[in-house]
Design a protein with these regions (language model features):
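Generic beta-strand/beta-sheet core signal
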Residues: 1-2, 52-56, 69-71, 88-90, ...
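Short, compositionally stereotyped local motifs that mark structural "simplifiers"
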Residues: 180, 186-359, 365, 369-371, ...
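Active-site neighborhood of glycoside hydrolase catalytic domains
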Residues: 1-83
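Hydrophobic, well-ordered secondary-structure elements that form the walls
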Residues: 44, 68, 166, 238, ...
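Short, charged beta-turn/beta-strand-edge "cap" motif at the junction between a beta-strand
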Residues: 412-416
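Glycine- and acidic
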Residues: 18-26, 147-152, 175, 246, ...
Length: 449
């Protein structure tokens, strides 16, 4: 907000009235924040209460009796404790944000991002060594995990985020350092999960994950080697005949090869016999889709723009064409036709469709990932994010593609679903060859029409 205060006439008037001036350490707007916090502190203290504030309250000068909640790393907490202020440690950089993912984001409910396992939470020490050495450790009054709710659309998802990481939080808050033992915590977690079952709590069970990003559609030309891991030691069972796995199904012990089109169903099993949600993975044998014979192309994609906000492609198909056409050099231009500020106030929404060719560099199976509404290759719908919160490309697919030009169609719908504006995405389409570890974006040099 301090950036907004620079343009706010009322804020600037208050700065002048109070004689607040910026210096080398703090801007006038930070001084305004300190003025406000200290003024509020007097109100709070008058009613027998004590102020607690996020570590931003350090900016501009700390209120005399305030307790600081250190969330932007530990630095704010260390600074406050060094000034003899009480501190609650809650740094996101150290795993104290348990609204973050705790498994592969490709197969988990959408989240704000980040990655924090129960092990990471458990291993955090809320009293930094620097404070302990300086005799200031007693100013750390507690530790907290945060669970922000913008992606908690129902109680089940909330519980899925919180448990079992909240159990790890309780132990780092109450257990002496010399008594902490993560392996023992894992053992006791098996028992705790039975108790959670008794209370009907929907806790996270690690799913079988594939290396380099999980995907529920695996194309291959010769054979596919299926490799799975879990981020906590866990039994995995699977079937290859389309039936649902049970605790007595074949136990996964090592990677296995598939040479014909097969449906793999695989799930984790707890010591209690309870199973996690099974994953269904279609493993399809394909021949290389042939490249197109095109006499002449020019760089970029043809793009048509439609004014207005469309929540689905069906709405877009019924829209009146505007005739707004242009050539774009990169897929990024699909999403940046209008400014997309953090507030999204006053944004004039639009949709866009881009068509042309993508040049595949060599024969192979490619995994395809994007946060756009749809990605089509050779007339086939590859990525469909319709109706979803468009973050973290959670509907990847794969295809066997020959070297050369392939038809591509990209669809962007500017709208807000689940609190996330699709305009904030970078419009990229990412490819990963099956023998590569990382996705790379389709570049301008690969696009033509």
């Amino acid at each position: 907000p301090k950036t907004s205060w620079e343009k706010c006439p009322l804020c600037q008037a208050r700065i002048r009235k109070e004689g607040l001036k910026g210096d080398k350490e703090h801007s006038a707007e930070e001084k305004l924040q300190s003025y406000f916090v200290q003024r509020m502190e007097k109100v709070v203290n008058k009613h027998g209460k004590k102020m607690i504030g996020w570590d931003e309250i350090l900016e501009g000068g700390l209120a005399p009796s305030a307790t600081v909640m250190s969330w932007r790393g530990e630095e704010g907490g260390i600074a406050a404790a060094s000034m003899n202020h009480d501190v609650i440690m809650t740094p996101g950089s150290e795993g104290m944000y348990i609204d973050q993912f705790q498994g592969d984001y490709k197969i988990n409910p959408v989240s704000i991002g980040g990655f924090t396992t129960a092990e990471r939470v458990y291993k955090y020490n809320p009293v930094p060594d620097t404070l302990a050495a300086a005799g200031k450790g007693h100013f750390i009054k507690g530790v907290q995990c945060n669970v922000w709710s913008e992606y908690l659309y129902n109680t089940d998802i909330m519980e899925y985020r919180i448990y079992p990481r909240i159990l790890a939080l309780s132990e780092i808050a109450w257990s002496p350092l010399d008594r902490k033992d993560y392996k023992d915590f894992e053992r006791r977690l098996d028992n705790a999960q039975v108790r959670l079952d008794g209370h009907g709590i929907n806790y996270y069970i690690p799913q079988p994950e594939q290396p380099n990003g999980s995907c529920n559609f695996v194309a291959f030309t010769d054979k596919a080697t299926m490799t799975f891991t879990t981020n906590r030691p866990m039994k995995m069972v699977y079937t290859l005949d389309g039936t649902e796995p049970t605790p007595e199904s074949t136990v996964y012990t090592a990677p296995f090869d598939i040479t014909e089109t097969t449906t793999v169903k695989i799930a984790s099993v707890l010591p209690s016999g309870k199973m996690g949600k099974p994953r269904t993975i279609l493993v399809e044998k394909q021949t290389l889709a042939p490249a197109k014979e095109v006499a002449k192309t020019t760089p970029g994609l043809d793009m048509e723009v439609f004014d207005g906000m469309y929540l689905s492609v069906n709405n877009l198909e019924a829209a009146q064409k505007t005739g707004k056409k242009q050539v774009i050099k990169t897929t990024r231009e699909l999403t940046n036709q209008v400014p997309a500020p953090e507030s999204m106030r006053g944004v004039k929404q639009y949709a866009a469709i881009a068509t042309g060719y993508v040049n595949i560099p060599e024969d192979g199976v490619y995994y395809i990932s994007s946060d756009l509404e749809e990605v089509w290759i050779d007339g086939k719908l590859m990525v469909n994010n319709g109706g979803e919160v468009k973050r973290f490309s959670r509907h990847d697919t794969s295809a066997a593609l020959a070297k050369g030009l392939h038809e591509i169609k990209l669809v962007f719908l500017g709208h807000i679903i689940g609190g996330w504006p699709s305009n904030w995405n970078d419009g990229s389409v990412q490819l990963r060859k099956s023998d590569a570890e990382k996705f790379t974006p389709i570049t301008a040099e690969m696009l033509s029409h």
